Every structure is written in C-alpha cells, then in structure tokens.
C-alpha cells in the first residue's frame, strides 16, 4: 500500500488508469453542470465519460471530493454562466452531491459570513435545491439520461425514481452493493403503475416508464 501520495490527473483517461491501479481511496474532481456538459477550462471528457467516472468510483469505493462546484463562480450569474442562466449555490451543491461516488463538496469561501451562508444548504426546501432547470440547456447527448434529480417526483406509486435509476446504473457496471441497495428500497421498479407522471415532468426527456420495465427485468 502506498501512503501519503498525491498526484494530478490531467484528463479522464488518466483518471480511469489511476482507478485501474486500485491504489487510491479518494479522488478530487471538479463537478458541476458546466464541466459535465463540456463548458470550461477543466471540462475534461464528455457527458458519458464523466458519468462513467462517477459510477466507477462508487463501485470501487473511491470517494469523490468535489472542487469547483460553482465553476469558479461562473454558474452563479446570468452574465457569466455558459448557459446564459444562473444557478444558486445550493442548486450546484445538490447537483454535485447527487452524483454517484460523491462524498463531499468543497465550495470556496472568502469569509465566515460566506461559510454561514453555504451551511444554510441544510435548511433549504426541495424546491430551492431543485436543479432541473439545467434540462433546458443541457446538450443533445444528455437527453434521455437520468441525472437522479427527482424532478419527476412525487411518484404516485411511492417510488424513489432517482434512487432506482442510480442503483440500476451502478449495477450494470458491476457494483454488487447496488443490487442490495436496490432490493432494500421500500418501493422499486416492480411497483411502477405506468401512469406516465414521471415522463411528463422529466426535464431530460427520459422515458422512465420504459426504464422501469427494463430495471424490473434486470433485477428480476
């Protein structure tokens, strides 16, 4: 085992190679909608490539500590956001925390007052944390892919749709624990009544009714 080693990773391929070594316990990585959708200096990799890193870290038990959740502050203003629409700090933090493998988010702060403001994240309503607006400016390749935002909630059947999708995505890449977590859910894809409520609300145009059938068939 190698202790106390810190190295830089210049791109997505390097991260995958590092994960291949099975030597790391933690990965510091910049996670935010801009970088995930290929906007910004540190936007390494495409939508699918970055998603694979998140899922693989979860599978391997490598915790992701998030840097630059606000894309250097650019996402907080209509004028500087690459999407032309601002997000709040709380939306950005929630976005990062919803990614597989993410354990901590480390936003920058210049004062105690800013830290106090960020800590109010824990006092926010679900509506204040809802970042589904990014569906309106996500790139075409992101369409049809669940990001676990749960904007489709509440499910009339009581299914935690985001969790069901996350555990399915993790299970399909070989995460054995994901199956256990899925089966431990109070409600799962088998409880779907195909009412279409989720499809009508999804900002990413995910066909959740079809997904639920696929997930049901996968887990048996």
What is each model feature region?
Residues 23, 48-220:
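Structured C-terminal cap/extension of enzyme domains
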Residues 1-65, 70:
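Glycine/proline-rich, positively charged
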């Amino acid at each position: 085992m190698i202790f106390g080693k810190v190295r830089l990773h210049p791109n997505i391929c390097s991260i995958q190679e590092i994960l291949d070594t099975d030597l790391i316990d933690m990965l510091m990585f910049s996670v935010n909608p801009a970088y995930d959708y290929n906007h910004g200096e540190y936007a390494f990799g495409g939508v699918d490539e970055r998603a694979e890193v998140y899922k693989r870290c979860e599978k391997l038990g490598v915790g992701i500590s998030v840097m630059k959740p606000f894309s250097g502050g650019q996402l907080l203003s209509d004028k500087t956001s690459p999407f032309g629409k601002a997000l709040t700090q709380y939306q950005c933090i929630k976005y990062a925390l919803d990614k597989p493998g993410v354990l901590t988010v480390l936003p920058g702060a210049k004062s105690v007052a800013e830290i106090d403001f960020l800590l109010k994240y824990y006092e926010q309503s679900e509506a204040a944390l809802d970042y589904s607006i990014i569906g309106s400016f996500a790139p075409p390749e992101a369409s049809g892919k669940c990001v676990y935002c749960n904007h489709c909630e509440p499910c009339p059947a009581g299914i935690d749709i985001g969790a069901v999708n996350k555990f399915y995505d993790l299970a399909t890449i070989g995460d054995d624990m994901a199956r256990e977590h899925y089966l431990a859910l109070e409600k799962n894809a088998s409880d779907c009544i195909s009412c279409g409520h989720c499809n009508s609300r999804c900002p990413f145009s995910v066909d959740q009714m079809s997904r639920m059938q696929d997930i049901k068939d996968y887990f048996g």
